[in-house]
Swiss-Prot record:
Family: Belongs to the glycosyltransferase 1 family. Bacterial/plant glycogen synthase subfamily.
PANTHER family the UniProt entry points to: ALPHA AMYLASE DOMAIN-CONTAINING PROTEIN, GRANULE-BOUND STARCH SYNTHASE 1, CHLOROPLASTIC/AMYLOPLASTIC
NCBIfam families for the chain: glgA, PRK14098.1
Catalytic activity: [(1->4)-alpha-D-glucosyl](n) + ADP-alpha-D-glucose = [(1->4)-alpha-D-glucosyl](n+1) + ADP + H(+)
Entry keyword Glycosyltransferase: yes
Pathway the protein contributes to: Glycan biosynthesis; glycogen biosynthesis
Protein's name in the database: Glycogen synthase
Keywords: Glycogen biosynthesis, Glycosyltransferase, Transferase
EC id: 2.4.1.21
Residues given in the record as ADP-alpha-D-glucose binding sites: R20
BP terms from Gene Ontology: glycogen biosynthetic process
Transmembrane segments: none
Length: 489
């Protein structure tokens, strides 16, 4: 095939820095840029949530993308589109907005979240159909629509049914990346029946009276990827780690590929990072202490250069380990350390963490709403990053952390272990606990804290972590190959 610049549209429910709940947002902040550097033209579409500040991110209206009619079976809603460039790039990012669906601040949720499932189901249908209607109005035809997680999983089915006879969409291929198999988008079937034609509804994967969005996407997409080879193997097993998708993923294993995450080293580099207190490098680490002091001050903790500072940056749900963290708190506060917890999500966990922060104000800090700048400072200022997630597809935070000399302590679930050289005989880049229990977590963290006090071995560990190359280059090349194979006639 003659090499040409193909076009790829990325569709996601979250993109950093506009909105962030999970590592998906960090992935979307850098991966499209890496793909562009391989010779593709990349663009992004996402919802315009009420939390997204137009002025801060320089969003502007596009006259020809206003009042787009989105025809659903029982009604027609209007879609308005705003656009800006992904920061530090020229990648056009389109924000799909309808006041009824997106003025509310919440991200997409499903029946297991306890939120208004009727509105959320209508919102997800509107968004998926709206992406395709926006492409038609825009007149920009991608060669590939690359969907991410359950939020965009209806698009492959729509292309195979109601849009199949539309010449504009002819020959468009679809890719679905599974970042989080725990969140599958379980929604009431009756809402789909009200809004979508029978040819679409008959292709939905139903479980009694519920639709599984992610399963539907897996069934109808052309190509499947996830963010590590280990995770690709894990989710094909028909066990509890697959949450019901193991069998269909095993059936589609020839179309399932695991490719490791990377990071944008232009955005995440302590030697050039403009968002941290003081820049530093593997050759000159003294600046890390300044960032620790700044983080302690900003988080409201007592300033103590000697006391180890441990951080957690994760959404508050069981997939990301909020349950394990909550069970471990009593033992964690008994350790000689400080703890910064950054995240949001389940209100029960938020209350648990807030209560501990109020009970131990000089030792525990909770940051529910935080900026991109604070996250950079946290990564630079922490001594240790604790990742209690049950099964990480790959993770991004540990990659950021190691690049900044912050040592990860992680659970051995999923593909995260592909990125960390477990400490053995004094050599490694992080710590891994192998049982999903509070004793295992606290025990491994205690090992890390003990090494932190070793003035000879800890700097060696930091040096090993910072020496690793996590740039997107090799992973982007793998995607380049997959994309081109998919598009071969």
């Amino acid at each position: 095939m003659a090499r040409r610049n193909f076009k790829v549209l990325y569709v996601s429910g979250e993109v950093s820095p506009f909105v962030r709940f999970s590592a998906l947002a960090d992935f979307m902040a850098s991966f499209p840029q890496a793909v562009e550097e391989e010779g593709f033209e990349a663009r992004i579409m996402m919802p315009k949530y009420g939390t997204i500040n137009d002025r801060k991110f320089r969003l502007h209206d596009v006259l020809r993308l206003s009042d787009i009619e989105v025809h659903l079976k029982e009604k027609t809603d209007l879609l308005h589109v705003k656009v800006t460039a992904l920061p530090s790039s020229k990648i056009q990012t389109y924000f799909l907005y309808n006041e009824k669906y997106f003025k509310r601040n919440g991200l997409f949720t499903d029946m297991h979240s306890g939120n208004d499932t009727k509105v959320n189901t209508e919102k997800i249908i509107f968004f998926n159909v709206g992406v395709l209607e926006t492409l038609q109005r825009l007149g920009w035809k991608p060669d590939i629509i690359h969907c991410h997680d359950w939020h965009a999983s209806l698009i492959p089915l729509l292309l195979r049914t109601v849009y199949a006879s539309n010449e504009f969409f002819k020959d468009i291929k679809t890719v679905l990346t599974i970042h989080n198999i725990y969140r599958q988008g379980i929604l009431p079937f009756k809402i789909f029946q009200k809004l979508l034609p029978e040819e679409v509804c008959s292709g939905l994967h139903r479980q009694n009276d519920e639709v599984n969005m992610l399963y539907t996407g897996v069934e109808h997409v052309d190509l499947l990827t996830t963010t590590s080879k280990q995770y690709a193997d894990t989710i094909r097993l028909d066990g509890e780690e697959t949450y019901g998708l193991g069998r269909i993923l095993e059936e589609r294993k020839e179309n399932l590929h695991g490719i490791l995450n990377g990071i944008d080293t232009r955005q995440w580099n302590p030697a050039t990072d403009k968002l941290i207190k003081k820049r530093y490098s593997i050759e000159r680490l003294d600046g890390k202490a300044d960032n620790k002091k700044a983080l302690q001050e900003e988080a409201g903790l007592s300033v103590d250069a000697e006391r180890p500072l441990v951080g957690v940056i994760a959404g508050f749900d069981e997939f990301q380990g909020a349950d394990l963290l909550a069970r471990s708190l009593e033992k964690l506060v008994a350790l000689d350390m400080q703890l910064v917890i950054c995240g949001s999500g389940d209100k029960v966990y938020e209350k648990t963490f807030r209560d501990f922060a109020e009970q131990y104000p000089e030792q525990v800090s909770l940051q529910i709403e935080y900026t991109d700048a604070f996250m950079h400072l946290a990564i630079a200022g922490m001594d240790i990053l604790l990742m209690p997630g049950r099964i990480e597809s790959c993770g991004m935070m540990q990659l950021f952390a190691m690049s900044y000399g912050t040592i990860p302590v992680v659970y051995a679930g999923g593909g995260i272990i592909e990125t960390i050289h477990e400490l053995q005989e004094g050599i490694g880049s992080g710590f891994i606990f192998h049982e999903y229990t509070d004793d295992s977590l606290v025990g491994k963290l205690s090992e890390a804290l003990a090494m932190y006090s070793d003035e000879e071995r800890w700097p060696q560990l930091v040096h090993e972590a910072m020496s690793k190359d996590f740039a997107w280059k090799s992973s982007a090349e793998e995607y380049d190959q997959l994309y081109r194979q998919l598009l071969e006639p």
